[in-house]
Amino acid sequence: MAATLLDVCAVVPAAGFGRRMQTECPKQYLSIGNKTILEHSVHALLAHPRVTRVVIAISPGDHRFAQLPLANHPQITVVDGGNERADSVLAGLQAVAKAQWVLVHDAARPCLHQDDLARLLTISENSRVGGILASPVRDTMKRGEPGKNAIAHTVERADLWHALTPQFFPRELLHDCLTRALNEGATITDEASALEYCGFHPALVEGRADNIKVTRPEDLALAEFYLTRTIHQEKA
C-alpha cells in the first residue's frame, strides 16, 4: 500500500563551488536580500508542514555554514558531502535511514513556490517510484554538431521538459539506485537519472519556470526579482 501524508525528510547537497558564477564565494552563500541563497532554498522546504527535517551536505572544509542561523536550527542536520553531487546525496540519505520518502533540492534553487512543493508531495499517496518538478520546454531546441559551433538539427520539443528540484522518491529506492549507478560508472546528472538508469520512470509534476537554479552571474538578479515579487504577493 502506498504511503500517504507521511512526514518527509529533505536532502540539500551544498558541497559544490559553482565556478560559473565567477566569484570566490560558493554560490549558495551569496546573498539575496538579508539571506543567503542556501537559506532561501532551505526555508522554502521547511515552510511545508510535512517536511520535518533537512539534511545539508557541505564540504568538509566549509567554514561559512557555521556562521548562518541555519547552523542552530533544530530541524537541520549537517553532514560532510562528497566530490560529486551523488556522493553528497548518499551521505544525506545515510543520515535519514529511517525516512520512507525523501526530497532532494538544489542548494542554489531559492525560488521554490509552496504550491509546487505541495503538489509534488502528493505523489506519495499513489506512487511507489516518486517524481520530480519539471517545466515544459518552450524554446526551440537545437542539437549542435560535435566539436563545432554549428547546428546539427532541430530537436522536437513536444515531449521535452526541464528537470527542476525538488525531486521526491522513496528513500530506499533512491539509495539503491544511486549506489548501483555509481558502482557501474553511469553518468548521473540528477537523482531521477539514477532511477532511470535502473529502469524506473518517475513522474513529471509541472512546476513554475521561475523556480530557477542560480548558476551564472546574471541569474542572481533574476532570482532576487522573483523572490521579491513572491514576498509582495504573499503580503498582498
Swiss-Prot record:
Its EC number(s): 2.7.7.60
Reactions listed under catalytic activity: 2-C-methyl-D-erythritol 4-phosphate + CTP + H(+) = 4-CDP-2-C-methyl-D-erythritol + diphosphate
Alphabetized UniProt keyword annotations: Isoprene biosynthesis, Nucleotidyltransferase, Transferase
Gene Ontology biological process terms from the UniProt entry: isopentenyl diphosphate biosynthetic process, methylerythritol 4-phosphate pathway
PROSITE patterns: ISPD
Keyword Transferase: yes
A GO molecular-function annotation: 2-C-methyl-D-erythritol 4-phosphate cytidylyltransferase activity
Keyword Transmembrane helix: no
Pfam families associated with the record: IspD
Highest taxon in the source lineage: Bacteria
Pathway in which this enzyme or protein is active: Isoprenoid biosynthesis; isopentenyl diphosphate biosynthesis via DXP pathway; isopentenyl diphosphate from 1-deoxy-D-xylulose 5-phosphate: step 2/6
Site positions (Positions MEP for the nucleophilic attack): 157, 213
InterPro entries: IspD, IspD/TarI, IspD/TarI_cytidylyltransf_bact, ISPD_synthase_CS, Nucleotide-diphossugar_trans
Annotated site, Transition state stabilizer, chain positions: 20, 27
Enzyme class label: transferase
Family of this protein: Belongs to the IspD/TarI cytidylyltransferase family. IspD subfamily.
Assembly, per entry: Homodimer.
NCBIfam families xrefs: ispD
PANTHER family xrefs: 2-C-METHYL-D-ERYTHRITOL 4-PHOSPHATE CYTIDYLYLTRANSFERASE, CHLOROPLASTIC (PTHR32125:SF4)
Described function: Catalyzes the formation of 4-diphosphocytidyl-2-C-methyl-D-erythritol from CTP and 2-C-methyl-D-erythritol 4-phosphate (MEP).
Record-given protein name: 2-C-methyl-D-erythritol 4-phosphate cytidylyltransferase
Organism in which the protein naturally occurs: Salmonella heidelberg (strain SL476)
